[in-house]
Structure formats: structure tokens, C-alpha cells
Amino acid sequence: MQAEMNQSAEVTMKTFFTMKTRETHPQAFVAPMATATMMPIDTGDNSTEAGVPGEGKNDVFEKLKEKFMNELQKIPLPPWALIAIAIVSGLLLLTCCLCICKKCCCKKKKNKKEKGKGKKNDINMKDVKGSGGNQDDDDAETGLTEGEDKEEEAKEEEKLGKIQFSLDYDFQANQLTVGIIQAAELPALDMGGTSDPYVKVFLLPDKKKKYETKVQKKTLNPTFNESFVFKVPYQELGGKTLMMAVYDFDRFSKHDCIGQVTVLMTKVDLGQQLEEWRDLESAEKEEPEKLGDICTSLRYVPTAGKLTVCILEAKNLKKMDVGGLSDPYVKIHLLQNGKRLKKKKTTVKKNTLNPYYNESFSFEIPFEQIQKVQVCVTVLDYDKIGKNDAIGKIFVGSNASGTELRHWSDMLANPRRPIAQWHSLKPEEEVDVALGLKK
């Protein structure tokens, strides 16, 4: 047994030595390789049989290597150049591989994100479907109306106060008596936290006929106790609307409308006296009404102290009569410190909205006083029965503004020369405030 083991060990050592020598010197040991493979081995070791295919592969590799080296020797380049080319080629391949890897990674990340978003959208859509489509529609509608609701709430919160009035109709005299009793909880429009309220009363659509209460100074709860009478036949009263507007008086600017109340006469039981409170509503802002234009000429002679005012013509006057025309005439007042010193007036022009006058009026004014006076020009509609209503008004003087001040300055800069200019008529109240005239 010991002898057999020693014999197998010797065979193994010989085989190992033979393979090593073949690797280093393959051509010198081709013949012995065949004898080694044909030796019988009793121990059953198949290591020599496994070496046969390995030796064939090595031969092929060696042949390819020899061919490659032969081809390299044929290339007319030095070895270092070939090595450099190989290194550059390897680097290029490496960079290409890195770029491809990065692109693949980026695509994977994008796909993951899109999948995540898709999942979220799916969840949201499920939530929407679960809540129901009708609910979404309702939410959209409520979203659109939220702004409107806020505006309505703001309007409701903005309280303008209230007014107490009375109505009484006399069927025998055909007249409506409107009583303005008091107002309460008015907003403060002045700097001191108060207001100077008064009330205007109209029986629309006729704005020509209006009444005004007295101004109650520095109060938010004024008491008026004033009555006004409108002579209206009962048959015509159904088409009328009573309007009561509360204003804040301001001596130096336009009066602000605090609020108003409108009463449709068709909804009022005139068989008995009515007395009630009503909340004031905000007045709708109306564009300024066009009253017409007037052309005047001014001439001043300093040495003689003589001012000549010529009323030339007017155009596009407001319609004041039922027939759509007016009977206009012009009043000229000479004022100083809000006091009327002298008064002149033109003739009446019947049934026209574009009257032509060419009438002159003279006033004696010393040169040292010319900067202290104002000339007020008022266009009125003549009425045989009732009061003559003012259509519009302007004034010129050193304290005027706009075209009126420019006209006055041109007159003083050009003594003895008549200077003519057109002026747009303004509401009577606005001009009276600017002049400081009393109500």
C-alpha cells in the first residue's frame, strides 16, 4: 500500500513538472506530451486528461499572439506611439461607458418621479371621485361668489344712518305735504368727527322743483321738523317718486351726499297720514349734467375805472320747459367779499336753447378795487307763474380758477381791449360755495 502511494506521488510530480516546462518551452516538448497522455494511471487521477484541452487553447492563444506581434512589426510606427494610441482609445471607451451609465441613471430617476406623480394623481382623483362631482361644482360656484358675498357684506356693514319723515295728502287741495322730522346715526364726514347735515326733497321725475331744509351744524343726529308742499293732482301722483337726500354742508367745497331714500308713490296708502323711519341708501354717482356754454366779453379801462361786461350768446342750454325748450335770460352780479353790490340782467329769449344777446353792461370800479371784486353771470329760465330756475352759473375774478381766471387775467393784461371767451356753465350751488355765498 505504501509503495503504491509513493508511485502515484512520483507520477503526479512528473506531470506537474512537464506542464510547467510546456508553458515555458512548448515546441521542445510536443512529442513527450503525447506519451504522457497515454500513460495508464491506476489511482484514477484524471489530471493528465484534463490538461489536453488546456494545451490546445494555449497553442491557439500563442499563435494569435505571434500573428498580432508580426502585424505590429509591419506597422511603420514606433512602439511608444502605439502605446499612446492604445491609451487614448481606452480613455475614449471609458468616457463613453460613463456617459451611457449616467443617461441610464437619469432615465431611471425620471421614471421613478413620474411614477410617484402618477400615484399621487391617482390618489387625488380617487379622493375627488369619492367626494362626488356635484360637490366640486358646488365648490366652484361658491368660489366664484365669495368675492360678491364679501362686497355685499361690506355694503351691509357700511351704515349710512336713517331718516324719519311723514307724508300727508290733501285730496281737496290736491297737495302732498312732506315732513322731514329727523335723522339719526349719520356717518362723520368732517375732521372733528361730526357732520353738517341738511336734506334735499325732490318729487321725481321733476328735478326742477326741490326743497331744502336748514343746515344742522356739527351733529350726527339732526332734528329738522320742517314741512314742504308739492301741488300735484291725485291722478298724476301715481307716476311720481319722492326722493329725500341727506347732504353734508361744506363751505369750501362741493357738498357730499351722505345717503338717500326713495319712495314710490304708487306703493303709499294716501288715505291716511304716514310716518316712518327708513335706512339711507348710497346715492349712485351720476355724471355731471351738461348745462350749456356762454360767451362773454370783458373790457376794463384803468384810467376811467370802468368795467364793461358784454353777454354775447349762449348755446346748448339745458331743457327746462315741458316742450323741450327754455326761455333763457342772464343776470350779472357785481360782488365784493360775498356781498352783492350791483345787479344787471338781459332780455328774455323765448323758446330757444341757443340764445343770442349781444348786450353790454358797465360798472364803475376804481383801479385799486379791481382785484377785490368778482363778476357773477347766471343763466336762468324765465317762468311766468313760478320761480325762475337757474340753468347754470360762472364767475370771473382774481379768486376764480381755470378758464374764468385766465379770462380775467387776459382782461387786466390788455387794458381798453375787449376780451371774449366761452365758458361752460356750472351748477349754481357749486359756484355759490366757491364765492362763499350763504345758502
Curated annotation (Swiss-Prot):
GO terms for molecular function: calcium ion binding; calcium-dependent phospholipid binding; clathrin binding; phosphatidylserine binding; SNARE binding. Ca(2+) 5 binds at residues 321, 381, 383, 389. GO terms for cellular component: axon; dense core granule; plasma membrane; synaptic vesicle membrane. Binds 3 Ca(2+) ions per subunit. The ions are bound to the C2 domains. Residues 102-439 are cytoplasmic. This is Synaptotagmin-B. Residues 159-278, 290-423 form the C2 domain. It comes from Diplobatis ommata (Ocellated electric ray). Spinal cord, brainstem, midbrain and electric organ. Residues 119-129 have a biased composition (Basic and acidic residues). PROSITE patterns: C2. The chain crosses the membrane at residues 75-101. PANTHER family: SYNAPTOTAGMIN (PTHR10024), SYNAPTOTAGMIN-2 (PTHR10024:SF223). Belongs to the synaptotagmin family. Keywords: Calcium, Cytoplasmic vesicle, Glycoprotein, Membrane, Metal-binding, Repeat, Synapse, Transmembrane, Transmembrane helix. It holds the Pfam family C2. Residues 135-151 have a biased composition (Acidic residues). Ca(2+) 2 binds at residues 189-190, 248, 250, 256. Signal peptide: none annotated. Ca(2+) 1 binds at residues 190, 196, 248-250. May have a regulatory role in the membrane interactions during trafficking of synaptic vesicles at the active zone of the synapse. It binds acidic phospholipids with a specificity that requires the presence of both an acidic head group and a diacyl backbone. Glycans are attached at residues 6, 46. Ca(2+) 3 binds at residues 250, 253-254, 256. It is found in: Cytoplasmic vesicle, Secretory vesicle, Synaptic vesicle membrane; Synapse. It is a single-pass membrane protein. InterPro entries: C2_dom, C2_domain_sf, Synaptotagmin.
